[in-house]
Amino acid sequence: MLRNKKILFAFAMLFSSFVNARELEPLADFVHRNPQFMTQLKDSQMLVSRCSALYVVLSVRLNEMQYKKDGDDLIAHLTKASESYELGRLTLSKAGKYDEPSTRFLQKDFAKKYSNITLANWKKDRGIFEDLINEDLKVCEDYAPHYKKLAHNLAKYIGR
């Protein structure tokens, strides 16, 4: 009976991880499918909300794990990147299609999904930088300089 419960629990965790990962389209697929996304305000707002959420979740998870071994630099990097994307989210909200509460709600939804995925990854093999997390992190890292510059220029334009 206990063995069956363990098997059922393991299956539920695996299924939960799969469902959460499938709820989010990989950012690389999104960028490939929509190469002009940076010119679309709605798509840019989605990406900055999602990257901000990813960085927040990763920095919190690493703090929870008391990650060391150059971890302090990594946590500081993730926190700073989160702040940059948050500034981008706020600036694009002022200039854009969705107001700040809408993009904040979107960001919280992404954070919840990323949190579930990192927790499932941790329970599975004691690593959080797996699959979708690692793939999305690469996209967020690649686009961070572009969104930082865009947020800076938009802030000047809208008189922030």
Locate each region found by the language model:
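N-terminal signal peptide c-region/cleavage motif recognized by signal peptidases
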Residues: 16-18
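Stable alpha-helical elements in mature extracytoplasmic
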Residues: 23, 44-51, 133-136, 143
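Sec-dependent signal peptide recognition
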Residues: 3-10
